Amino acid sequence: SPGYAYERAPDQQHFLNRERTKTMFREILSRGRGGKNWDFTNSTLFMDFLAGNQTYECTPWSMPLLTVFGWQKPCYLLGEGYVKTFKELMEGTEWEKYGVGKYEKCANCMVHCGFEGTAATDAIRHPLKSVPILLRGVKTDGPMAPDIDLSRQRPAEFVFSRHVEKKMSEIRTGKSDTTEAAAAE
């Protein structure tokens, strides 16, 4: 997956935006017959998405992450909070507020934790859609699929450090109630 401009990285200008990501993947994949020369563990439709041939929405709930702090929400790249249980993650996260075109932090994201699940769902719903890619490889030239409009996304909120500081304070004082049993629910 492409590098993602997460808020804690000190060097923000070297992360790829969506257009540069698509161009880079097209250049790389064109050297390997659209990826046919290499074994990838990602789905064909996800690779096709990275090359700009699919327009996908993020599904961050498709790859949830459990940490020592609890279940990270909405995804492990944003880390905008933690909850104790999987049920609380799934039912208490306002999923509609996240994703490309919805949240400024997500504007350039094309990472597997948000889009591989979308590509897998697309492959299940449209099983023949992968066949041309399997036979000929990922298309590396021609027009790209339209991208998602960013004009109505909400501004970024920088909250990660606050969440970590709070949890570390709880751990130091022995007041942390995050347990394996609670997290597994």
Language model features with spans:
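Radical SAM enzyme [4Fe-4S]-AdoMet core and its adjacent flexible, acidic
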Residues: 1-63, 68, 73, 77, ...
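Flexible mid-to-C-terminal extensions adjoining Fe-S/redox cofactors in radical SAM and related proteins
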Residues: 72-185
